[in-house]
């Protein structure tokens, strides 16, 4: 039984019902429908913290999905799971792959910046200020890209960029 049919909470049930209706009314191939079903089940598993199950569903969705835009969101979600698991190198790889297919994902740029900023903080704790500055500079570049795509968002990042004099805003 697909995961979407066994969820108990109202939001998950509502999402599943809407997704199933969309699958029926939008003209798509059976492969696209199967890919979306795996993607949807991956999102539900991810929202419940079942990351191994979510990854299995996302990998299957990737195998079936041919649209680069849709694949970008699958890759982004895989990156989120690796971020949650502390696997930052893998997460960065998946965010990069998502952005190759869809360069208009500000949330991917933001998450990459957060990882770089975290690595900069870790370098400071290890006493390596030169490496820390390189990580912070990289974080700044990613945040600038995220902010350029969605100027009203990422206020904390904008403040950090101003405070550290890495970016001037009008």
Curated annotation (Swiss-Prot):
Localization terms from the record: Plastid, Chloroplast thylakoid membrane
Organism: Zea mays (Maize)
Keywords: Chloroplast, Membrane, Photosynthesis, Plastid, Repeat, Thylakoid, TPR repeat
GO BP terms, alphabetized: photosystem I assembly
Entry function: Essential for the assembly of the photosystem I (PSI) complex. May act as a chaperone-like factor to guide the assembly of the PSI subunits.
Name recorded for this polypeptide: Photosystem I assembly protein Ycf3
Keyword Nucleotide-binding assigned: no
HAMAP family noted in UniProt: Ycf3
Pfam families: TPR_1
Renumbered ranges of TPR repeats: 35-68, 72-105, 120-153
Membrane topology, as annotated: Peripheral membrane protein
Gene3D superfamilies, sorted: Tetratricopeptide repeat domain
Cellular compartments per GO CC: chloroplast thylakoid membrane
Top-rank taxon: Eukaryota
PROSITE patterns for this protein: TPR, TPR_REGION
Family: Belongs to the Ycf3 family.
Coiled coil, from the record: none
